[in-house]
Amino acid sequence: MEENNLQCSSVVDGNFEEVPRETAIQFKPPLYRQRYQFVKNLVDQHEPKKVADLGCGDTSLLRLLKVNPCIELLVGVDINEDKLRWRGDSLAPFLGDFLKPRDLNLTITLYHGSVVERDSRLLGFDLITCIELIEHLDSGDLARFPEVVFGYLSPSMIVISTPNSEFNPLFPSVTLRDSDHKFEWTRMEFQTWALYVANRYDYSVEFTGVGEPPAGAENVGYCTQIGIFRKNGGKATESCLSEQHDQHVYKAVFTTSYPSLQQERFFKLVLVNEVSQQVESLRVSHLPRRKEQAGERGDKPKDIGGSKAPVPCFGPVFTEVEKAKIENSPTPFCVGDKFFVPLQRLLAYPKLNRLCANEEMMRSVIADSIPLSSDGSAVVADLRNYFDEQFEF
């Protein structure tokens, strides 16, 4: 449940008017971005597959995390259904996601519900985040919160951030940073609570934060304090999870899936496109050599100089090992007006090699989309096409 960060400088929700502009503490980047970046850095480091953000608010953190290639399931939970419906579309795939599919599947779901309710669809997660959430809970919900999140959901890692009240005196006329906050803890209060919860539910915890204090006020600590909880022994086993009864109390208000190379139609689309591009690149690079050979035989090839010459395309930069692998692979060749590129040659290129494990796999995927030689060992293309003639190439 994220705080408002007005004018990208205030950390005081709803109280910016009370803080004189000349005394407002400036955070660069803004504090809310520092919190999100902190979570993203953890995701980059630990590569969780299943991530849930409790109290996801306007889904800003989810939008930041959805581009991470390791995540396969991303879930947001919030009590404000209207906000979830309004922001859901911002999590849907864009055109670029279809043009360049992810390696792994990604499903994003937004649930309307309370974080102190048990829903079995959030079992077995690698990471659950609670960014600026707990201070919005009343005493009853705060008591139930550990039972649900740590005891029932029991993810591998939990990140909880909350305001550090020791920082508040640096903001003029501020007691609580948001009118909806039920409390704000000192570092000692937060750490006492966190250590008790960690010990009870078999987690370890370490403390850090974001939002450096100004010079001369280092003793107050970070503006936002953060606890990182790690499950001792890792994630709950599949057998333990299977013993949990299904409880679907949350209401799904938005869900979307991203195209990926794990989906047959998108894998084929990408592979056919990559093969076609590589064959075309090899064909075009082969034409000047053909003209040189024609000149040696006494033929008179057309002039390729001047403005009609096509602009050369710059391909990827290969390592010495990759270059050697390509050079040692079967060479493209011509038979009459046809240009042949062996599949083994294509598989020598790193990008295609990453997509396809072997020649048989490549052949089976592209056979009905790209012309192949009679024995299926090479892609066949016309040596010259309409555009070559137009450019007198």
Swiss-Prot record:
It comes from the Eukaryota. The keyword Nucleotide-binding does not apply. Binds 1 Mg(2+) ion per subunit. It comes from Homo sapiens (Human). Methyltransferase that adds a 2'-O-methyl group at the 3'-end of piRNAs, a class of 24 to 30 nucleotide RNAs that are generated by a Dicer-independent mechanism and are primarily derived from transposons and other repeated sequence elements. This probably protects the 3'-end of piRNAs from uridylation activity and subsequent degradation. Stabilization of piRNAs is essential for gametogenesis. Belongs to the methyltransferase superfamily. HEN1 family. Its EC number is 2.1.1.386. S-adenosyl-L-methionine binds at Y36, G55, D78, K83, V115, I131. Residues 290-305 have a biased composition (Basic and acidic residues). One of its GO terms (molecular function) is RNA binding. Residues 286-307 are annotated as: Disordered. Mg(2+) binds at E132, E135, H136, H181. Its cofactor is Mg(2+). It catalyses: small RNA 3'-end nucleotide + S-adenosyl-L-methionine = small RNA 3'-end 2'-O-methylnucleotide + S-adenosyl-L-homocysteine + H(+). This is Small RNA 2'-O-methyltransferase. One of its GO terms (biological process) is piRNA processing. InterPro entries: Hen1, SAM-dependent_MTases_sf. One of its GO terms (cellular component) is cytoplasm. It is found in: Cytoplasm. The keyword Metal-binding applies. Pfam families: Methyltransf_23. The gene is HENMT1. Keywords: Cytoplasm, Magnesium, Metal-binding, Methyltransferase, RNA-binding, RNA-mediated gene silencing, S-adenosyl-L-methionine, Transferase.
